[in-house]
Design a protein with these regions (language model features):
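Cap/lid segment of the alpha/beta-hydrolase catalytic domain
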Residues: 61-72, 92-112
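N-terminal cap/lid segment of alpha/beta-hydrolase-fold proteins
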Residues: 20-45
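Residue in the alpha/beta-hydrolase core beta-strand immediately N-terminal to the catalytic nucleophile
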Residues: 132-134
Length: 144
């Protein structure tokens, strides 16, 4: 009987894992010759979208498989699935392709180019999900 209960519990957990939306990596053209890499988690029927802006230097260096070279411990980055679990399309943005080396976003967050990159991200979300878009930043991410 106990083995059967364990089997049922394991099966239920596997279905729960399958039900979670899988993250995808999107490279969005934002400026001539520049792309914005984003990790996107899209739940079924999102209520809104959140753009998560990590603090620090902002160079997450998201790999094509969705892993990070830096920032995995950042509060927003590590909480990304919690946002998606609440029905929010969740987007973790990296530094753009022309800022993938130190100093990454240092001194860049206040520029017109950064605004252009974020505007392109917001426009893509509004077109893709057709939901309200919220920007969420911590520490230096709030400068964006």
């Amino acid at each position: 009987m106990f083995k059967r209960l364990i089997g049922i519990a394991a099966l239920a957990l596997s279905f729960t894992a399958l039900a979670q939306p899988q993250p995808t990596v999107v490279d969005l053209p934002t400026r001539p010759g520049v792309t914005q890499r984003m990790l996107v988690i899209t739940p079924p029927e999102p209520k809104a979208a959140v753009v998560l802006l990590a603090g620090g230097h902002g160079g997450l260096q998201i790999f094509p498989n969705g892993s990070f070279k830096w920032g995995e411990g950042n509060f927003l980055v590590r909480s990304r699935q919690l946002f998606a679990d609440k029905g929010l399309m969740t987007v973790v943005v990296d530094a753009p392709s022309d800022r993938q080396r130190a100093p990454f976003l240092h001194g860049f967050r206040q520029t017109a180019e950064h605004v252009t990159d974020l505007q392109a991200t917001i426009a893509w979300l509004k077109t893709t999900a057709k939901v309200p878009v919220w920007l969420v930043g911590t520490s230096r991410g709030t400068q964006s």
